[in-house]
Curated annotation (Swiss-Prot):
It comes from the Bacteria. Part of the 50S ribosomal subunit. Contacts protein L29, and trigger factor when it is bound to the ribosome. Gene3D superfamilies: 3.30.70.330. InterPro entries: Nucleotide-bd_a/b_plait_sf (IPR012677), Ribosomal_uL23-like (IPR013025), Ribosomal_uL23/eL15/eS24_sf (IPR012678), Ribosomal_uL23_CS (IPR001014). The keyword Amino-acid biosynthesis does not apply. One of its GO terms (cellular component) is ribosome. The gene is rplW. Keywords: Ribonucleoprotein, Ribosomal protein, RNA-binding, rRNA-binding. HAMAP family: Ribosomal_uL23_B. This is Large ribosomal subunit protein uL23. Belongs to the universal ribosomal protein uL23 family. The keyword Chaperone does not apply. GO terms for biological process: translation. One of the early assembly proteins it binds 23S rRNA. One of the proteins that surrounds the polypeptide exit tunnel on the outside of the ribosome. Forms the main docking site for trigger factor binding to the ribosome.
Length: 96
């Protein structure tokens, strides 16, 4: 099994993700090869919370240009994690 800190890359801090925190839903960028079960186990191992549900979204790379040089941004995978009602909050989002 992979290390949980290799699966969870970073939290996503946006207006929408901050509003979803009231419903105990937290948003993270995750590894593009990870699945829902790995994300659930990683969140429970890192933060010590109980996960109810995991939704995952894939983002395709976008075409970008700098002068005459063309390329693509890297593809992303985002996970929205819903905690159980009796679970504690995730502390990483408290200071934001």
């Amino acid at each position: 099994m992979r290390d949980p800190r290799d699966i969870i890359k970073r939290p996503v801090i946006t207006e929408r993700s901050m509003e979803m925190m009231a419903e105990k839903k937290y948003t993270f960028d995750v590894d593009v090869k990870s699945n829902k079960t790995e994300v659930k186990d990683a969140i429970e191992a890192i933060f010590g919370v109980n996960v109810d549900k995991v939704n995952i979204m894939n983002y395709k790379p976008k075409a970008k240009r700098v002068g005459r040089h063309a390329g693509f941004t890297s593809r992303r995978r985002k996970a929205i994690v819903k905690l159980t009602a009796d679970s504690k909050e995730i502390e990483i989002f408290q200071g934001v």
